[in-house]
Structures are given as structure tokens and as C-alpha cells.
Amino acid sequence: MKLLHIDSSVLAEHSVSRQLTARIVTEWQATHPGTAVEYLDLAQDTPATLSGAELAARMTPADSRSAEQTAAAARTEAFLQQFLAANVIVVGAPMYNFSIPSQLKNWIDCIAQAGRTFKYTETGPVGLAGNKTVIVASSRGGVYSTSEALRALDHQESYLRTVLGFMGIDNVRIVRAEGVNQGADRRSQALAAAEADIATLV
């Protein structure tokens, strides 16, 4: 079994999501001995932002690419193959301005490719990357899960569920720590709740 451990927070050792992903991976290895873990830090190894040039590199036949296009396409392909090879993916996804970090969005733009991880058919899109388990370590400075009005502001967990589902992944588990910027007591409570969830979700 292969597990891909992804962090995307820019806060380094101050990051709650990094703390949670580390705990999740440790628990997974304890309950699934022999799991091979590969680590990807998107804050350090950031995929290129999707652009016209980036898309052209992917779409141009390999034997017609420039040197720059060949390098760009190879980098994108490496991220995609790493994703496809994983049976389990643990993703650290803090909420930034109601959504996800740009580094994580760039990674998603690498792996969400028509004909590779999903396809369009006459009856609608079909995911091609199923049979994976994704565990999302969600951290939030505020609280956004306690009412419909607050949940409407969530373009973090909801987006991840949507895009992963579009690629055929419906086994998405969320470990959430929210309100972590609302004082030391609230932060401690949020982390304790998340730790308890890890024990039941892994």
C-alpha cells in the first residue's frame, strides 16, 4: 500500500494542518503496517500555476515540444503519476480566505486532467481515479460548521469533496480543527477534538 502525505500550509512549524497530517500518517502506519509513505510539501515544491503556456506544454505532442515545454510537461506528469500511484492520500488543507492555499490548487490543476483522472461522456463526466482513500486535515482560524450561513462561506472542504468526487474519489474523510485563532483555550479544544476524530477515521 502506498500513502501520499501532502502538506500545503505556509506556516511551517506553526501550522495546525501539518501537525494533524503528521498525526494521521503516524496512526495510519500503526494500523496498516508496511505502508510506504511518500511526502510532498507543496509550500516548498510548488507546482506551476496553470497558464496558457503550461497548458500548451501538456497539449503539444511530445515530439513537437520545445525544451521548456518538455520540462514543464514532465514536471506536471510527475505530480500526476505520484497521485495515481497512491492508494491513500493525506492532505493538509488549511482554510485561506474561505478556500484552500494556492499551492494546493496548483497541485489539483496538475492532477485534474481530462482523459487521465476524469472523462466526459454523452451522459456526463465520469471519474477515473477512484479506489483511493483521501483524508483531509482541515484547519480553520474561525468556526464555519455551526450554521447554514457559516457553512455557505466554506469553499475549502466543500471544494475538495467536489473536485475529488469529480475524479471518482468518494471515500473522503475530514479531520477538522476550527476556531484555532480564537484564543489558546479554543485552539486546544479544537486540536483535542481533531485528535479524537483521527482515532476513529484512520
Swiss-Prot record:
Q: What class of enzyme is it?
A: oxidoreductase
The GO terms this record gives for MF are:
electron transfer activity; FMN binding; oxidoreductase activity, acting on NAD(P)H as acceptor; oxidoreductase activity, acting on NAD(P)H, quinone or similar compound as acceptor
Reaction catalyzed: 2 a quinone + NADH + H(+) = 2 a 1,4-benzosemiquinone + NAD(+); N,N-dimethyl-1,4-phenylenediamine + anthranilate + 2 NAD(+) = 2-(4-dimethylaminophenyl)diazenylbenzoate + 2 NADH + 2 H(+)
Alphabetically ordered keywords of this record: Flavoprotein, FMN, NAD, Oxidoreductase
Keyword Flavoprotein on this protein? yes
Q: Which Pfam families match?
A: Flavodoxin_2
- Give the cofactor note text: Binds 1 FMN per subunit.
Q: Which residues bind FMN?
A: 9, 15-17, 95-98, 139-142
Gene3D superfamilies attached to this UniProt entry: 3.40.50.360
Q: Which cofactor does it need?
A: FMN
Q: Which domain of life is it from?
A: Bacteria
Write down the EC number: 1.6.5.-, 1.7.1.17
What this chain does, per the entry, is described as: Quinone reductase that provides resistance to thiol-specific stress caused by electrophilic quinones.
Task: Give the family from UniProt.
Answer: Belongs to the azoreductase type 1 family.
Q: Tell me, how does this one assemble?
A: Homodimer.
Query: PANTHER family, per this entry?
Result: FMN-DEPENDENT NADH-AZOREDUCTASE 1 (PTHR43741), FMN-DEPENDENT NADH:QUINONE OXIDOREDUCTASE (PTHR43741:SF4)
HAMAP family tied to this protein: Azoreductase_type1
Query: How is this protein named in the record?
Result: FMN-dependent NADH:quinone oxidoreductase
